Amino acid sequence: MNYKITSDSTCDLSCEQAERYSIGILPLYVQLGDRTYQDGVDIFPDDIYQHITAGGALATTAAVNLSDYVRAFSALSRKYDFVIHICISQEFSCCYQNACLAAAEYENVYVVDSRNLSTGHGLVVLEAVRCAEEGMEPSRIVEHLQECTAHVDASFILSRLDYMQKGGRCSSVAVLGANLLKLRPAIEVKDGRMGVCKKYRGTFEACVKAYIKDRLQGKTQLDLRRVFITHSGVPDEIIETAKAAVLSYQNFEEICVTRAGCTVSSHCGPGTIGVLFLYER
């Protein structure tokens, strides 16, 4: 069957991955100053960082709107036998709600809530591609993806909290304490929501090593086909440290290093890195 897999830009897959697997990307919106941009189209995380460093206000993000989904689904539904669109968790955005409303007009368009964000979302997108390539019926793919969302392990560790403070997600007292004690919080996604899972103390490099050890050491029943190391802008040596740590605990076939897009980066700021992978069903 002729098919198309699409996703919100929050999947944080690289341009190369999207091109390789013919994944259609629908961008979220980013409000920066008095202008509105499209994530990954005419604005990128470093643009946001430069704006804020220059004294500008924190960027805000908005969902893919209903008309964008209708326009995309209308064109794709005529061209392909079926279309499957995977959204960022509905706990983080109204993308899923908007996509469902748009898809209701087309019998061959299906929408799945990834229950995740960033490459936790991206892992579900790539699983959709795999299923479609194997010739699964669309209804079975949707069912499989809904089961798959519970098997995504998505987490990040932050080196700084100033963006979280500016966004009202932590207090200035908490930021001061974290800076004084060199605390680096790790955040994980559970049931479609984010929460702090552990706080690490020390240099960021040491904390990254400890964080990856906690996520991977001694873990069984992992899907070893692929792991993502996704970051919002960290030094190359931190990425190399993360790659070495991952391989010291698990023998993944592929390590994908990707940059987080504007949605994640505008909330956490630079200096965030995570490992994201699947458990076997």
Annotate each language-model stretch with its function.
Residues 1, 59-60, 86, 161, ...:
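Short, contiguous strand/loop micro-motifs
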